[in-house]
Amino acid sequence: MSESNNMHVSGDGAKQSVYTEKKRVKVYVLENNEWKDTGTGFCQGTVEERTIDDTQTAEKMAYLLVVDEDSDDQVLLKSRLEQNIEYQRQEETLIVWKDLNGQDIALSFEESIGCDSLCEYICFVQKNIESRISLVAVRSTDDGIGSVHEIITGPVNLPSNVPNQTEESLLEALKILNENTSFDYLRNETIQFVINDHYLATLIRSFYQSEESKLYRNLLLLSNIVKTLILFNSKEILEEMINDENFLCVCGILEYDTEFPNSKLNHRQYLKDKEPNFKEMIPISDPTIKLMITQNFRLQFLKDVVLVRFLDDQSFTFISDLMLSYQNSIIDFLQEDSNNFINQVISMYKVEEDSTVTPDKRRDGIKLLHECIQLSQNLNSIEKTLFYKFLIKKGLFQVIQFAFNMETNNDIRILATDIVVGLIEHDIQLIQSVQSDEVTLLNDENSDIDSTDMSLLLILTKILLTDKSPGLKEQSFQALVSLLDPEDYIVDDYQNHDDNIDTRIDNMLQIQNGKNHDGLDGERNHEKFQLAEYLQCFYRQVAPSLFHCFIDGSVNLYECDQQLLIKLVKLLNLMIQGHEASISRRFILENGILIRLISLASSDYILQLRLAAVRCFKNIVFLNDDFYLRYLIGKNLFDPIFEVFKENLNEDNMANSTILDFLKSLNTQLKVVEQEDIPLSGSKSSRNFMLLNKYICGRYGDILLKADYVSFTREMMAIYHEETQKLASLSTTETSFDENDNTTLEVEV
């Protein structure tokens, strides 16, 4: 706000300057608890300057002046803005206050713009002439019952900034800072004080003095002060904290914690050991980007390590958003062709014989690319996809091939696998673009390019089967799960990447049984065709190696790694439930995999593996597939299942519960058939379950009868006897699964 040209000298010799335009207003005063209208006029903000005789210094005094609208000579109000008067702006057009004489005064403006003008004038006076006055906005709450006060301007209590801080001054500073977080105005004024008056430097100086003198109470107070400053959620304060000069000191202050007053963390030592490991493999020409990389690391260290127990949701989000702004800038820089940064990294893996590129440098390159992937995790989906496609197009998979085929360092191979997992979890269809010159989800129908390259699956299979690192095995397993999950392949924005494999299989079962099923429209037909081609290649090129221990009868499963067998059973379960039966079933049955699978239910193996085998077996049964059921019954593959049941018949454990759950599910299906009164010669669905019940009750009835503590085993036996009588009356001795099928199954009892 600037002084207008309207200036004159009053009768007492004071110079009067006008700071606002005239605004029409009504003046009210409170008398006997009622507001009295004292007239309508024009209000202005004025400043009078007088010379004090004793000191010959100029003194400025600010006034709210209202003159009558009909006569400029008649003053309706002249009120000085002084001392600790609080002005309240109520709603849009009202300013209310109590002067030093105790008189309540209100100005009601004709337009809100007039009220705005006078509020700006009050702010000007508070900043430049009378710092003790204040202006507060008062607004009604949404429910109309209460009111909300917000400071617009006013005196701000600030911490002492003297060089030598005492325990008392630090305690007072902490109190003031906590109070100043209550209102935006106080918060903003405090932020300006911290930045402009270099308050952080004062705290750091006090920290060194206190640590040297072992003033532990001061150190704890300093830690709480810095934490409170972080809660101001100011980019300026945070960036000052993480600059080269202050970061180590700030972390040192935060090593002290009032929750653990008798101990101290060692953030500074960690940083001294860690920060020298920052390597600039490829020179970064932009100093701003170099600074952002450092700032991003330091903010992440504060957020995830130093302040992990302290940050509230708002501050956590604020720091995360600030990091995201850095990360976006860094990712944008990496994608700029002009700086050639990624090209220089990828080129180290294109010529293996290049003696100028050392193995350590190639390892550092993989670490760098892994950091790039990690850096992109918080980007939105579209930006992340564009960045991943950029990396793939530049040759990311050449780096991964090197890591899997040439690198022997386990840590580096784990990082490479983590890169693959990150790509898969974001968008599995990116993997299908590896062999295409253009990074697209799928090749054109008329393209000669093979979109079903299995090299990545073969690499992951090799790692899963042969690598000695448990971490690498687990990552390879998760990558295979994602690559073999048809839901990931078909659904664009698949949201269940964090689901474990058992949850995925349950979802598939629901879809198979008609639940949770949205269907696929015609636009996805091409994707389904590509999926079928992809899976056929998998069963032809990869599955024989992946399930070699199940296919080769000479392999003693008991000598295999049982944790690996659990993973293979889960993958098998995924394939059986999720892949087209016409593709997966042939591979599984022709290679006798189910025979080896069910042998894992025996007592020779750990319980977790036995239960995984039983669950897989159960899921096969409830596919209600004619071919599988014929095979299972014909080969008597239920024997190991009921052997486990017999062993745990009277036990309250997972083995018993798992098999009881299988029997209960079968009984539920039988009840549905019975309630619908479907004859044995009815639908395939009904006949399959009735025949399965006949087989189970006939072969394992003695075990079922001993499980008399549950009702459904008795119900299964009752249905079995009833159906046996019906068959006897019909003189039927053999049953076909299909009236038009020449294959007849002798049900063994």
From Swiss-Prot:
InterPro entries membership: ARM-like, ARM-type_fold, EVH1_PP4R3, P4R3-like_central_dom, PH-like_dom_sf, PP4R3-like
GO cellular component: nucleoplasm; protein phosphatase 4 complex
GO process annotations (BP): DNA damage response
Main location: nucleus
Signal peptide feature range: none
Keyword Membrane: no
Localization in the cell: Nucleus
Keyword set, alphabetical order: Nucleus
GO molecular function: protein phosphatase activator activity
Keyword Nucleus found: yes
Protein task: Core regulatory subunit of the histone H2A phosphatase complex, which dephosphorylates H2AS128ph (gamma-H2A) that has been displaced from sites of DNA lesions in the double-stranded DNA break repair process. Dephosphorylation is necessary for efficient recovery from the DNA damage checkpoint.
Record's subunit section: Regulatory subunit 3 (R3) of the histone H2A phosphatase complex (HTP-C) consisting of PPH3, PSY2 and PSY4.
Annotated protein name in UniProt: Serine/threonine-protein phosphatase 4 regulatory subunit 3
Annotated source species: Kluyveromyces lactis (strain ATCC 8585 / CBS 2359 / DSM 70799 / NBRC 1267 / NRRL Y-1140 / WM37) (Yeast)
